[in-house]
């Protein structure tokens, strides 16, 4: 690694071009971003995954070879093998790599290098990381700071999950991988902390929420400064070991504060103040209070790096969100079709609140995600959905988890019905869901497909895209 900023044209020439990195699981949103960043630095890159996808096809078009399936032969001629900590140590590719003297590195070690290479921003938190990271990069771009970015979603402004630039490196840091705790960055942006990615037998999950929150504290403690959400209870207790501590939010006394909020059906206009000094007016073109906070964080970070507020705010006003985060898919009989990644209770509640802001009848197609997550949070999921006018609950998206006895999607729908919701039903037949919505959708509706599984496919089917 060099001292030049990540992903710059200067740094690309400094990396020996003969190095060959092979990335397992290259079809994942994060690993594919690593592949693109490495390729931009002049490294020879290849990868493999179990199934083809739109992402793997894009990588091939970009000149990055992708093999389907896993095979020890993939490591032949490879210098470095990148694999998630979740990959079993006895996996044939890992065994073959170690036997051949190939360096095996976890993904987080690679991200650590990128964060340490120059000015950097690491975004952590249980919710809002992808949107906040995207907004920071877009705001910095608008302000002329030419950021590089690593995002856990496709950013429409970039047409990719990465951006190559010579300015600060902005990265989404995923707490589902325990390796994040040892990373170091210049500025840590801390959105919130809750109990996701905890328990069960996932190799990289945390045993307890206390352990996870201690890891959050360790991460921000290693940063030169932290910008944390003043509105989220308890975050101030997790940032006590950080160097410079700044916060943002709606709370009185926040260093960066959003005031005079004016919500409408399409988003929210608000005023930004820095320690009492008005910086100007901003707008986020996505509904929901959570998106006001995400945008405020982005404007605060841009200000900290010397960016122009007005041009940053203008860029954010045109921002329409990364893929699967309140993503407008199209229309059906005049109804607005939205797809959203919300899969835990806090995200679901935020998405429902955003839908209510549109002023339309809120109709949700919800797909619970993972048996373990459903087991841990089905009452909260049900309660979070109570604000919708109608909820169709699909079967659980398993994410390759084995079934847990007694854990079923009907736990959510039954609790809602027992709590007095008259518009909820369990709907396992997807074809019937599509037929029903096509027959009943009208211009007064917003239909939101919601979940981290493949429920997004229904939104495309409904909108005929």
UniProtKB/Swiss-Prot annotation:
Q: Output the GO biological process annotations, alphabetical, semicolon-separated.
A: cell division; cell wall organization; peptidoglycan biosynthetic process; regulation of cell shape
According to the lineage, what is the superkingdom?
A: Bacteria
The family database entries (Pfam families) matched by this protein are listed as:
Mur_ligase, Mur_ligase_C, Mur_ligase_M
- Main localization category: cytoplasm
One GO cellular component term, please give it: cytoplasm
Query: Which InterPro entries has this protein been placed in?
Result: Mur-like_cat_sf, Mur_ligase_C, Mur_ligase_C_dom_sf, Mur_ligase_cen, Mur_ligase_N, MurCDEF_pg_biosynth, UDP-N-AcMur_Ala_ligase_MurC
Which keywords has UniProt assigned to this entry?
ATP-binding, Cell cycle, Cell division, Cell shape, Cell wall biogenesis/degradation, Cytoplasm, Ligase, Nucleotide-binding, Peptidoglycan synthesis
* Record-listed E.C. numbers: 6.3.2.8
From the Swiss-Prot or TrEMBL record, give the protein name. UDP-N-acetylmuramate--L-alanine ligase
Organism equals Deinococcus geothermalis (strain DSM 11300 / CIP 105573 / AG-3a)
Report the gene name. Answer: murC
